[in-house]
Curated annotation (Swiss-Prot):
Its main location: endoplasmic reticulum. It is a single-pass type II membrane protein. This is Signal peptidase complex subunit 3. It is found in: Endoplasmic reticulum membrane. The chain crosses the membrane at residues 17-37. Keywords: Endoplasmic reticulum, Glycoprotein, Membrane, Signal-anchor, Transmembrane, Transmembrane helix. Essential component of the signal peptidase complex (SPC) which catalyzes the cleavage of N-terminal signal sequences from nascent proteins as they are translocated into the lumen of the endoplasmic reticulum. Essential for the SPC catalytic activity, possibly by stabilizing and positioning the active center of the complex close to the lumenal surface. Essential for viability. Component of the signal peptidase complex (SPC) composed of a catalytic subunit SEC11 and three accessory subunits SPC1, SPC2 and SPC3. The complex induces a local thinning of the ER membrane which is used to measure the length of the signal peptide (SP) h-region of protein substrates. This ensures the selectivity of the complex towards h-regions shorter than 18-20 amino acids. SPC associates with the translocon complex. Pfam families: SPC22. One of its GO terms (cellular component) is signal peptidase complex. Residues 1-16 are cytoplasmic. Residues 38-185 are lumenal. The lineage of its organism: Eukaryota, Fungi, Dikarya, Ascomycota, Saccharomycotina. GO terms for biological process: protein targeting to ER; signal peptide processing. It comes from Yarrowia lipolytica (strain CLIB 122 / E 150) (Yeast).
Length: 185
């Protein structure tokens, strides 16, 4: 006959195995639902740049290594319209959406990407993003001294954080999704 400790250990071992199998099934089924909904080819996000303004900031908080020299920072004003409701199913805990601008670096082999705005969406009812005249959430600055009138391409990225399973990533192209960074005046 087995002791009480061995019986308890066997029960917990079997329960954890069954729960692991159920968790794997939940993740696979919810992933299949996302594939069927074709979430990796959602319609484009409508992005419209309303304005941009460059300024020189003299704080380490704004990226300046030498507070006396300062660093060029850019603030953007934009409109954004995107429907992320197909990303939600019964296993979705939240969707993290963020808008990025990608531009060439000093050398040809360098591509820079900066985050303009982000939002955590916890409910399917709030998943249609409609922003009018929104300001960039973060101070935009480059490791170099200036953006030097560079052009940037805008994309809306998302990642799904499920209740069970691994994160799922994707992105949407933005219509009119380009920015010409202004010159510092």
């Amino acid at each position: 006959m087995h002791t009480s400790i061995q019986r308890i250990q066997q029960t917990f071992s079997q329960a954890s195995t069954v729960l692991s199998i159920i968790a794997a099934i939940v993740f696979v089924v919810s992933y299949i639902q996302l594939v069927v909904a074709n979430v990796w080819s959602l319609p484009e996000a409508n992005f419209n740049l309303r304005g941009s303004k460059a300024a020189r900031r003299f704080s380490r908080q704004y990226g300046a290594n030498d507070p006396k020299k300062g660093k060029e920072n850019v603030a953007l004003k934009f409109d954004l319209d995107a429907d992320l409701s197909p990303l939600f199913n019964w296993n979705t805990k939240l969707v993290f959406a963020y808008l990025t601008a990608t531009y060439d670096g000093k050398r040809d082999d360098i591509v820079n990407e900066i985050t303009i705005w982000d939002q955590i969406i916890t409910d399917k009812d709030d998943s249609h993003i409609k922003l009018k005249g929104a300001n960039s959430k973060y101070s935009l600055y480059d490791v170099e001294e200036s953006f030097r009138n560079r052009n940037a391409t805008v994309k809306l990225h998302w990642n799904i954080q499920p209740h069970v399973g691994a994160k799922i990533y994707g992105s949407l192209d933005a219509t009119k999704g380009s920015i010409k960074f202004p010159q510092l005046v």
